[in-house]
Every structure is written in structure tokens, then in C-alpha cells.
A protein has these predicted regions:
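A shared catalytic/ligand-binding motif for oxyanion handling
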Residues: 1-192
Length: 192
């Protein structure tokens, strides 16, 4: 998806040979179905961008709930949600309004989505300032439904370093449950 002003736009990348079927897109999401082959159950992946304006964020949550209603299959959603789930996901500057957090939590609950956790860096975004105005926040995350989690023996989300961007790279490592010969798959998503 094309950028809007200084924002980088959305991208979803996968390795050559992966069977990925496009479902839908907008300036705030890209939705695909991933078919691993070898009889593995297809699953859905959605790249998501939550509206940066807190007052407009309910529109983002409505979109996510609409996507949920369109297709009931194993589902993972990842990206910059522009929201946190708890106050410990933000360090510095002004506190978030508790109603904002509740709207995000309610949306994830309505969609049956669970945070996948992470290893490495605690925060995924930095405002680039120093001193008292420096703010670090976990805006980027991966969430999935139970059906998607049941497809894999192991799911690992890593927050990679913020080298060239104000957001960090999210890396997802999966170990399939279905195959006889256990193979490691590695997906990497980067905010563009």
C-alpha cells in the first residue's frame, strides 16, 4: 500500500514459493490466506495499521471486527496497532486514557485474538526525543486466535532492533504441528 505523507505505507512480504492468496486490502490492512501445502490447514494473515488519531481508532477496531466476521479460520494479525493493552507497555511523557486501552482490549476479545507475547526489546516504537520528552511504547504486536495457535508446536515473536526506523522489526518463527518431519519456518515483517 502506498504511503500517506510521512508514514511509510503497508507491505507484506513472504518467501518465494509460498502459496499466498490475496483476500482484501485498504490503506490500513492487507489480508491474505497462507497455504503451507503437504495437507496443512490454510490460515489467514492480516497486516494491520491502527489509526494514529486516538479519536479515530474505533474505526480501526470496527475494521478488525469486520474482518473477523468475514472468515472463520486460523488467523494471525500483526502490525502497528497504535495502541497498548496495559500501562506497562508505555514509558515516558503522557499517560494513555484508560478508555483507549479498553476499546482495544474489547476489540481483541470480540475477535477471539490473543497477544503472542515477545522476546528481546520491550518497546517497539520510540519518538526519537531525549530526556523527559522521550517516549517508548509497544505499539507493534502480533495477535492470533486459538485455532491459529493450535496449528503450531512453537510460536516465537521477536522484537528486533530499531536501526533505520522509529519502529522495530517484528520477526515470527513457527514450528508446524501437522508435518511428520518438523520444519522450521521463519516469517519476518517490517514496518515500511
Amino acid at each position: 500500500m502506498l504511503s500517506d505523507g510521512r508514514s511509510g505505507g503497508l507491505a507484506m512480504l513472504w518467501k518465494e514459493g509460498a502459496k499466498v492468496r490475496f483476500k482484501s486490502c485498504s490503506n490500513t490492512h492487507i489480508d491474505v490466506v497462507v497455504c503451507e501445502g503437504n495437507g496443512a490447514k490454510p490460515w489467514r494473515a492480516t497486516r494491520f495499521y491502527g489509526h494514529p488519531d486516538a479519536g479515530m481508532r474505533p474505526i480501526s477496531w470496527n475494521l478488525l471486527e469486520s474482518l473477523h466476521r468475514q472468515c472463520q479460520m486460523p488467523w494471525v494479525v500483526f502490525g502497528d496497532f497504535n495502541e497498548i493493552l496495559s500501562s506497562d507497555e508505555k514509558l515516558g511523557w503522557l499517560d494513555r486514557d484508560a478508555r483507549q486501552l479498553e476499546g482495544f482490549k474489547e476489540c481483541l476479545s470480540n475477535c477471539g485474538l490473543f497477544d503472542l507475547g515477545f522476546v528481546d526489546q520491550r518497546f517497539t516504537w520510540c519518538n526519537g526525543r531525549i530526556g523527559e520528552q522521550r517516549t517508548l511504547v509497544r505499539l507493534d504486536r502480533m495477535v492470533a486466535n486459538k485455532e491459529w495457535l493450535n496449528l503450531f508446536l512453537e510460536v516465537k515473536v521477536v522484537h528486533r532492533s530499531m536501526v533505520a526506523f522509529d519502529h522495530c522489526l517484528l520477526s515470527l518463527s513457527l514450528r508446524m504441528r501437522e508435518s511428520r518431519k518438523v520444519a522450521r519456518k521463519r516469517f519476518m515483517f517490517e514496518k515500511m
